[in-house]
Amino acid sequence: MTQLSRRAFNREALGLAGTRMAGLLSGLQAGRAAIAAHAGLASSASITDVPGIRAGHFTDPRRPTGCTALLFDGEATAGADYDGSAPGSYLGVLLQPASPIETIHGMLLTGGGPMGLAAVPGAVRYLEEHKVGFDWGVLNVRVPIVVGAVIDDLSLGDGRIRPDADAAYKACQSASTGALAEGNVGVGAGATVGKMLGGHGYHGMKSGLGTASLRLDEVVIGALVVANSSGDIVNPHTGGIVAGARRPDGKGFANIVETLKSFARSGRRESTWLRDPALQSTTLVVVATNAEFTKTALTKIAMMASTGAARAINPYHTNGDGDSTFAISTNRVKSDLGISVIGALAADLVSATVLRAVKAASSIEGWPAARDLAPASG
């Protein structure tokens, strides 16, 4: 919105500002309606609906782990918001506004804990072989910038099995503009939720990867979420728990926050009930748009998008989490939709996508999924 001086702040200016504000509100309302339309599990809604993005998975058949590659056709700009206390990233520092690097060529989301970041060079190799990257001024050398982020899934199966460079290369080979598969695939293969009370008879649940998109005329916003949290997954519209910590007797959800309150009141502070969770949870969020934005603007959009996950995960950003949110622009269209509008719509889309991540998941041994339990209030 154009900034008005005091002298220009007259009735005409007020009318102009009011008209613009009405347009922004109209955009928000249209966006919320589009999000509601995609709130189910329709396979047509995907981050790959954003022009300029291809995505693919590699899912390891030996244990629940894998990786997901996002490849950008043309010059993509990105910003990030790291609100978790222990994020695992590869070249993530390049997304800071102060970095001179303005373009990235790919992103790899991977399981395997910190060691899983060793997979990222496989995506770099794939892009280099396809002549994607910065011209380094050396004959036939191009340097692709691939940002990596990791979740901890080492407790599922044999933790010595992790995504490696070959796994990332295969994820890139499978990348397409088609609808991206959801659930126990790629980096979502080892995602779980509701782990904050683990080790005390309470049990978490299987989660996965979810994706969704919305369109506002020529502007497209997409989201991808890997829900791998210490906290419960909550429907922000009803307050009901969709997936999370289950009671030791198997009769419903524990409700982590209420359980923590009850133990605090009972004076059980000498036990491990009230200690911080181990470093075993990280939720990864990617939002993308074809609307043109700078790295600084995308950093703010990432901050706003992160609040969407906080509406659906409780508690979120615990001391043991590495929660990370990325915002990407493929710079295909110029739009008058501002940072706050895109950020608000992205946050709502992220909330819906968190729910998709758990609803699309399938049970594995010891980790039931929401779809396999009796219907809950969420």
Regions flagged by a language model, labelled:
Residues L24-A37:
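Signal peptide processing junction and immediate N-terminal pro/mature segment
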